[in-house]
Amino acid sequence: MFYNWLKLYKFSKMATLVEIERDFLQKTAQKFAPEVVALITKALDYSKKWHGEQKRLSGEPFFIHPLRTALRLVEWNMDSNTVCAGLLHDIIEDTQVTEADLTAIFGKEITDLVVKVTKITSESKKQRQLNRKKEDLNLKSLVNIAMSSQQEVNALVLKLADRLDNISSIEFLAVEKQKIIAKETLELYAKIAGRIGMYPVKTQLADLSFKVLDPKNFNNTLSKINQQKVFYDNEWGNFKKQLEEMLEQNQIEYRLESRIKGIYSTYQKLTFHEQNIAKIHDLFAIRLIVKSELDCYHLLGLIHLNFTVLMKHFKDYIASPKQNFYQSIHTTVRLKGLNVEIQIRTQRMDHVSKYGFASHWIYKEKKEGLLASALQVNYLNSKQMHSRDFFKRIFGTDIIKVNVSSDNEPNIVKKLNVESNSKLLDIAYELYPKQFNKLEKIKLDGVEVMSFDVTAENEMVIEFCFGKTNNLKRRWLRYMNNHVFRERVKKDLNKLKKAVKYSELPLYEKALEELHLKLADETQIKQRLNALGIKKLTEFLELIEYPHFPKNEHLYFLASNNQKWRELIKPIKFALSQAVFQNSYFEQIEGIYITKIVIETCCTKIPDMPEQVIGILMKNILRVHLHDCRELANQKQPKIIPLYWNAHQLKMRPRKFRCQINIRGVWSETTVNKIVQTIIEGDSYLERIIPKIDKQKDEFELNITMFIDNYHQLITIMEQITTKNISYVWKYL
């Protein structure tokens, strides 16, 4: 009943060397041909001979470590060369055996693997030393390690097996060294495991590290998980029974597995959800492994028709696999007080989810095994796959070059290598952390950008311009991809909670002091805000975060003894309106004063649609509708303003827009699944689908809410649905 984290140890603490060796030989005999087993046994005997009487700090024979490492590799379905290298991976480093000796006995391929793992270990230690005073081992450490291993994914997998065994027996080291290794494991090796798709290994590495680094929160989180497990045990059992009955009634062959979220992952989500474990939608999960992709979608349709589904958590990784080839359908159902995530996948997909990239080779020496897709095998076996391509595929990014200068150092241009997903603000903080809060402008190729929400591009010329006063904006946090920099900016904002607010009066007063000014009294503030149509000071402070005020008009406006404050009304209104439009996706409308644009959800409005989009101006707020929206009938003499999409903003800050459609047509057993699959394959995000099915009349009706890029994408999706031999008509909602 209880979640026993000790199961994360792959081997019993009581298992002896003899028992582990017996288990290892049995499993190799089951998975490999006799001639391959002979090679592995040769490596085992060689490793045992040279490690001899060496002992671990636990008092165990040292040889038990490479043996357990190799056993993990067998269980992870790695090839014989990698298993042999696992047995031999410490030979060169810890004995008198040389690289030449190893090559003469076991050949170049096995020796190269041993050497590469040694290089990864060396690079890891080097990075540990370089980063020992930093808060985080960032992705650049991963770059160096991935590059050092060239295209050998199996070298990384071998290193993960090595590290997993070491972290499992870490208690024999000094406490300080435990923490250093655990920190590196959590921030580096667990990330690598996740990036190459070995999620169970990632969980083990993260949880074992977490227990060392923060035992108090580890135990608290474990206790909360167990409390939830006990509290909802009956509900959990009833739900599984319902699922099994539904599957059997529909004659679907399946295997059902259940899992509870890892402890460290749960702790991270508890931090985000303010310690409310009930808000974690995937704490409990059921995996349903079926025979085919068609069964996956058939089962998805059954679940959505028979249970209450939380569509915002629906994800189809079959139609859109992850970078590491992970495929599965995730959907979440709501029970009585309990959310349960259901993962639907085929047997091959399940194999990939457990072993990641390690599962994608086809080995002739294996007696049996699952075949990877031709695409995966061709990619991984390609002679063209250089280390840079390998890194990009696994880690989802690449390295680009940018040229950076600042107005404080006008004659100095810094050439910088950054990750391709770096934002301009990431680069600004990395180079100018002390001046970052005073950043006023950014220029690209000499032209000032209208929004700081820009991703760096190769060979981009960037200039940062700084002012004299604090210009930090709350929204900047959304414009940064580097989570370490983002956390530091949060600290600068003096807010560690989820909603970081720069709109606090003390910060405004501090900015006034820097200009030798004082805040006006309450009566003066009220009078001046009324002139802007603003009721509260807090509202004003929120609004001034967005615009750029070249002459600090927003500060002088509320300064005491400023008799010319009325002269500032017009430029402030202009700046506020301009900022609102610049942070929207519409062309600026001259001559109107607005403090907010609200895209209403009552009707569909997407870029490039032929229908006219309009704004209704009400109390300085521009509310966006479709020209024939039914809600307009309720408005009394509305001030209607035609709006036009801003192509530049859509290009610079791409996003998806809410689209609501109604589809009606001829129903069949596969209709709903085909439509859902087509929508997701069209690179859209499906939020909600409400089906109405009349089987007697063979009719269906779907109300669908999804997020898409533009009208062209919507039309493409609808045309694709037509190719599925579905008879239907559709309209906007």
UniProtKB/Swiss-Prot annotation:
<dbReference type="GO" id="GO:0008893">
    <property type="term" value="F:guanosine-3',5'-bis(diphosphate) 3'-diphosphatase activity"/>
</dbReference>
<dbReference type="Pfam" id="PF13328">
    <property type="entry name" value="HD_4"/>
</dbReference>
<feature type="domain" description="HD">
    <location>
        <begin position="62"/>
        <end position="167"/>
    </location>
</feature>
<dbReference type="InterPro" id="IPR006674">
    <property type="entry name" value="HD_domain"/>
</dbReference>
<comment type="function">
    <text>In eubacteria ppGpp (guanosine 3'-diphosphate 5'-diphosphate) is a mediator of the stringent response that coordinates a variety of cellular activities in response to changes in nutritional abundance. This enzyme catalyzes the degradation of ppGpp into GDP. It may also be capable of catalyzing the synthesis of ppGpp.</text>
</comment>
<dbReference type="InterPro" id="IPR004811">
    <property type="entry name" value="RelA/Spo_fam"/>
</dbReference>
<comment type="pathway">
    <text>Purine metabolism; ppGpp biosynthesis; ppGpp from GDP: step 1/1.</text>
</comment>
<keyword id="KW-0378">Hydrolase</keyword>
<dbReference type="GO" id="GO:0005886">
    <property type="term" value="C:plasma membrane"/>
</dbReference>
<dbReference type="InterPro" id="IPR007685">
    <property type="entry name" value="RelA_SpoT"/>
</dbReference>
<dbReference type="Pfam" id="PF04607">
    <property type="entry name" value="RelA_SpoT"/>
</dbReference>
<comment type="similarity">
    <text>Belongs to the RelA/SpoT family.</text>
</comment>
<dbReference type="InterPro" id="IPR003607">
    <property type="entry name" value="HD/PDEase_dom"/>
</dbReference>
<dbReference type="InterPro" id="IPR043519">
    <property type="entry name" value="NT_sf"/>
</dbReference>
<dbReference type="GO" id="GO:0015970">
    <property type="term" value="P:guanosine tetraphosphate biosynthetic process"/>
</dbReference>
<keyword id="KW-0464">Manganese</keyword>
<protein>
    <recommendedName>
        <fullName>Probable guanosine-3',5'-bis(diphosphate) 3'-pyrophosphohydrolase</fullName>
        <ecNumber>3.1.7.2</ecNumber>
    </recommendedName>
</protein>
